[in-house]
């Protein structure tokens, strides 16, 4: 409840951080980022988007759900992973320099953390370069996703209203029945 949160921060001197996902990994639907961003000026909050399933797959350049919905520049903290669309390991958070410095020097998990091995870092940089320079790779991904989703529907499977690469398959019946497919 943002009304309640606004009252609390006015009493305590704190601030509000709204956290959501760019793509919800169980259903494949996108977070309502436009609607959330529209509330920022009224409630004065920062927005953190975990876009593990949108990064590399959504938006013109693959920048994710924020780019897809036209609100990427309104996201204050953008978090994603290289483990999904990049088929690698590691993660990143993007924000203003002051926020990144604060996190770097104040998050317990980061104070004594080690960097990723350089071959992994270089591989991730190469993957980012490919994302920017080879749009045909993302086009091929979407061609495959469309074939998969259409094929599942044509064969009577329920996949919900996904508009992303995440393709849930909803099964009716018991767990035993579902495992007998």
Regions found by a protein language model. Name each.
Residues 77-79, 86-135:
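Conserved core segment of the aminotransferase class I/II
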Residues 44-45, 64-82, 101, 105:
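Conserved active-site segment immediately N-terminal to the catalytic lysine
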Residues 1-49:
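Active-site phosphate-binding strand-loop segment of PLP-dependent enzymes
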Residues 16, 79, 113-114, 158-163:
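Short beta-strand
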Residues 139-148, 155-181:
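Conserved PLP-binding catalytic core of the aspartate aminotransferase-like
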């Amino acid at each position: 409840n943002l009304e309640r949160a606004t009252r609390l921060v006015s009493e305590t001197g704190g601030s509000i951080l709204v956290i959501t996902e760019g793509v919800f990994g169980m259903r494949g639907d996108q977070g309502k980022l436009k609607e959330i961003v529209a509330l920022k000026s009224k409630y004065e909050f920062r927005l953190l988007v975990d876009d593990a399933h949108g990064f590399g797959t959504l938006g013109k350049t693959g920048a994710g759900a924020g780019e897809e919905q036209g609100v990427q520049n309104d996201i204050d903290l953008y978090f994603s992973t290289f483990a999904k669309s990049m088929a690698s390991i590691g993660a990143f958070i993007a924000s203003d320099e002051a926020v990144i410095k604060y996190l770097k020097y104040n998050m317990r998990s980061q104070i004594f953390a080690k960097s990723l091995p350089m071959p992994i870092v270089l591989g991730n940089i190469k993957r980012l370069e490919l994302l920017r320079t080879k749009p045909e790779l993302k086009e091929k991904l979407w061609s495959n996703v469309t074939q998969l989703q259409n094929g599942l529907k044509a064969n009577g499977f329920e996949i919900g209203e996904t508009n992303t690469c995440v393709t849930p398959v909803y099964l009716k019946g018991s767990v035993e029945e579902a495992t007998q497919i």
